[in-house]
């Protein structure tokens, strides 16, 4: 097999822009957070590089999420509740929304992603008055449980009863989703579900990023 130090610049010679998709191994937190695969492409390709998904961030998806909220929000600073992801949290903080993260204890995100968000361990309390509910599951971050699943409690599933606590909130998920584990059929198939337009906005977010990168080549 060709070494990355040769393979990456060879790939760079074939194109103008490179999109890289890589994943966390959940064996070594420091290694995952260094984003070694993505960083090697940035360092050695000689081309503009964008992340299609990486160990700690999924920027095109979270950009699409932001576009979706901007399209559907009815107030300047909506309440957005992320319930039991790093990039989504970054964008919500950057947008200065009323952002709440709710999850079981032990699933705290890395501090740089929490930002100014309010962390609420009581999911029902967090959902009160929400305008958008973004469901996502993730593994533990803190040592010694990094990468582990600590809670399999179905009580965290987003269902109609919990959505009734909100201010007629829209439901969001990046897809694919495990139905009736993350969210019930009733919620994801409801008129307030934005999962399809949210997915469609992935095309828009990618187009915006690629356009900016290609303009920079001129």
Spell out what each predicted region is.
Residues 30-51, 145-166, 191-192:
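A short, gly/pro- and small-residue-rich
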Residues 1-70, 179:
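Phosphate/diphosphate ligand-binding glycine-rich loop within oxidoreductases
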Residues 112-186:
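Rossmann-like adenosine-cofactor binding region
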């Amino acid at each position: 097999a060709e070494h990355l130090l040769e393979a990456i610049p060879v790939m760079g010679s074939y194109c103008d822009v490179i999109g890289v998709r890589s994943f966390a191994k959940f064996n070594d937190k420091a290694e995952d957070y260094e984003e070694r695969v993505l960083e090697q492409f940035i360092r050695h390709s000689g081309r503009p590089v964008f992340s299609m998904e990486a160990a700690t961030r999924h920027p095109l998806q979270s950009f699409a999420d932001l576009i979706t909220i901007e399209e559907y929000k009815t107030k300047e600073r909506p309440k957005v509740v992320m319930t039991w992801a790093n990039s989504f949290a970054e964008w919500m903080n950057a947008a200065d929304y009323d952002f709440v993260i709710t999850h079981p204890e032990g699933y705290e995100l890395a501090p740089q992603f929490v930002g100014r968000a309010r962390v609420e361990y009581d999911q029902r309390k967090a959902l009160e008055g929400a305008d958008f509910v973004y469901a996502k599951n993730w593994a533990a971050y803190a040592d010694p449980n990094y990468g582990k699943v600590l809670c399999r409690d179905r009580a965290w599933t987003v269902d109609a009863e919990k959505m009734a606590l909100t201010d007629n909130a829209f439901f969001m998920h990046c897809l694919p989703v495990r139905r009736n584990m993350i969210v019930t059929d009733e919620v994801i198939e409801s008129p307030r579900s934005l999962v399809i337009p949210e997915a469609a906005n992935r095309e828009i977010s990618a187009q915006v990023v690629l356009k900016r990168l290609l303009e920079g080549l001129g």
